[in-house]
């Protein structure tokens, strides 16, 4: 089945990194190939512009895709956003030149020229406000257009605000908040492949910032060690084959490890081993 991934832009690299982390690795290195087999035998990647992915998924020819919430809203496509991903966050804002003195959308003059690639979002937003504006469709960078006198304002995604600042622009309104989403054709929401992909992505995210800690504990010190060892539910405890010693292991937040290790040693733990967690399926 086909999984659409961004072929360009700010979502491309983090999307491919996420898929690799969950075990979906492209098996072809030729970037000119639009359809690429992967290490998951039931998944092929199809490279597409992020703004086109909602349409591809809606068609049913493509089972799922990763794109921005802003592109989903702009397209108006009938797709299910089954999972919000932890990248691509930003705000779709209206921004004007700092020198304009405009501080709100209400201050925009009648017929103000708004440059954007989010034409549908812009039209609906200003229509709801009852503002008469002229929408200028742009497919590339919009930030320079006010400087050129082509637009009075822009409507675009702001991640950090640095690009706006460089071009002398300031945001005056937030239209919507966005982030990367896993989108699925509605008929595939309950499909086994969708459930598998969602499970592995959630498992990858759940493992972030956590480590697996293994330690050996003499029976006489077991209660003292368990009293200081955090766990998701309860630490796992196994009696070793020799001696009156137990192996204890637990999933632990990484940020508590420095102090925790010292407390465990003081409580009587020894042979402490700390390992990464690739995925945590809950």
From Swiss-Prot:
Pathway annotation: Amino-acid biosynthesis; L-histidine biosynthesis; L-histidine from 5-phospho-alpha-D-ribose 1-diphosphate: step 1/9
Coarse class of the protein's main subcellular location: cytoplasm
Name listed for the protein in its UniProt record: ATP phosphoribosyltransferase
Reactions listed under catalytic activity: 1-(5-phospho-beta-D-ribosyl)-ATP + diphosphate = 5-phospho-alpha-D-ribose 1-diphosphate + ATP
Domain of life: Archaea
EC number: 2.4.2.17
NCBIfam families listed in its UniProt record: hisG, HisG_C-term
Family designation: Belongs to the ATP phosphoribosyltransferase family. Long subfamily.
Physiological role: Catalyzes the condensation of ATP and 5-phosphoribose 1-diphosphate to form N'-(5'-phosphoribosyl)-ATP (PR-ATP). Has a crucial role in the pathway because the rate of histidine biosynthesis seems to be controlled primarily by regulation of HisG enzymatic activity.
Disulfide-linked positions: none
Transmembrane feature ranges: none
Keywords per UniProt: Amino-acid biosynthesis, ATP-binding, Cytoplasm, Glycosyltransferase, Histidine biosynthesis, Magnesium, Metal-binding, Nucleotide-binding, Transferase
HAMAP family to which the protein is assigned, alphabetical: HisG_Long
Classification via PROSITE patterns: ATP_P_PHORIBOSYLTR
Entry's Gene Ontology BP terms: L-histidine biosynthetic process
GO (cellular component) term, any one: cytoplasm
Cofactor dependency: Mg(2+)
Keyword set includes Ribosomal protein: no
Matching Pfam families: HisG, HisG_C
GO MF, any single term: ATP binding
Compartments where found: Cytoplasm
Name of encoding gene: hisG
């Amino acid at each position: 089945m086909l999984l659409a991934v961004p072929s360009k832009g700010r979502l491309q690299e983090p999307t491919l990194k996420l898929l690799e982390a969950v075990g979906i690795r492209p098996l072809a290195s030729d970037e000119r190939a639009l359809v690429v087999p992967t290490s998951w035998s039931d998944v092929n990647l199809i490279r597409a512009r992020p703004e086109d992915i909602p349409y591809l998924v809606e068609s049913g020819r493509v089972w799922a895709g990763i794109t921005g919430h802003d592109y989903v809203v702009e397209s108006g496509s009938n797709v299910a956003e089954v999972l919000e991903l932890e990248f691509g966050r930003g705000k779709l804002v209206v921004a004007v030149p700092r020198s304009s003195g405009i501080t709100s959308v209400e201050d925009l003059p009648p017929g103000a020229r708004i440059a954007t690639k989010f034409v549908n979002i812009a039209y609906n937003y200003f229509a709801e406000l009852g503002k008469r504006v002229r929408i200028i469709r742009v497919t590339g960078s919009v930030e320079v257009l006010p400087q050129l006198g082509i637009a009075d304002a822009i409507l675009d995604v702001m991640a950090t605000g640095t690009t706006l600042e460089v071009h002398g622009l300031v945001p005056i309104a937030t239209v919507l908040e966005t982030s990367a989403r896993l989108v699925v054709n509605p008929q595939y929401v309950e499909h086994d492949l969708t459930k598998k992909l969602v499970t592995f992505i959630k498992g990858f995210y759940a493992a972030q910032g956590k480590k697996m800690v293994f330690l050996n504990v003499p029976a006489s010190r077991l209660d003292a060690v368990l009293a200081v060892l955090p766990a998701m539910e309860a630490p796992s405890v196994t009696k070793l084959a020799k001696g009156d010693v137990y192996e204890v292991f637990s999933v632990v937040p990484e940020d508590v490890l420095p102090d925790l290790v010292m407390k465990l040693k003081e409580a009587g733990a020894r042979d402490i081993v700390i390992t990464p967690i690739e995925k945590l399926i809950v």
